[in-house]
Amino acid sequence: YDEIETLVNSHCLVYQNLWSRISTRLKHCQIFHGLYVIPHFRTMGALDGNYIFSTQNYFRLINLELIKNRPTNVVFIDFDYHASNIGKLKWFDDSQYFQNKQTISFDALGEICYATSRLISSYFGKLKKCLVLDLDNTLWGGVIGDDGLEGINIDSHNPEGEAYLAFQSYIKSLKARGVILAVCSKNEENIAKIPFKKHPEMVLKLEDFSCFIANWNDKSTNIRNIAIEHSGYSVFAG
């Protein structure tokens, strides 16, 4: 393991020195660095994941070491995640490498551009900050105004209800990351709030929402009013 650790540290030191040189010459420069994609080939076949010196684990260790020593002005792009999205057999192109030293396929270029542009955009504040949600058949199964509290489905022992609860948990995690939550629903407000107040399995609570609009006005008008209250349309997702 000591020999592998030495190789990994030596490999990472090259990048660490490069970051340092960039930061010295360009003050306040934000560096975007792509992490290694773990190769899809396995030099030891099915045993590759069992040994620290395998090719795949070597690149995993490099990625982890880079992350462990990341300066504050360096942001990593997890290309291994994006390679998994499209499939690593589609990500790599050996013929492209031998012809022009391009290790990735043309299929992967779109994913790379998308991932990189999104990360850079978020750094400059170009990201969605407010999520507008409907209620019926969105946060629970059924229609609260027709089915009542007992009739809507957010039952953790029911497959459909479990899916709604999982969705609510994900929305809750977005709030924890700083996303503003709002409700826009065609409903009677007092009825629409009942599940949040009385259903024991609701993950989301009324206090999780910065704005709660439930009425019979058209949704476009309601969303426009929410946008005015929360600094414009560009920050919205729904």
Regions found by a protein language model. Give the residues of each.
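Extracellular glycan-modifying ectodomains
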Residues: Y1-L133, L139-W140, G145-G151, M202
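Extended, H/D-rich, highly charged conserved domains that either
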Residues: I104-E111, E162-A163, F167, A176
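Conserved beta-strand/loop elements of the cytosolic catalytic core of P-type E1-E2 ATPases, chiefly
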Residues: S185, F212-W216
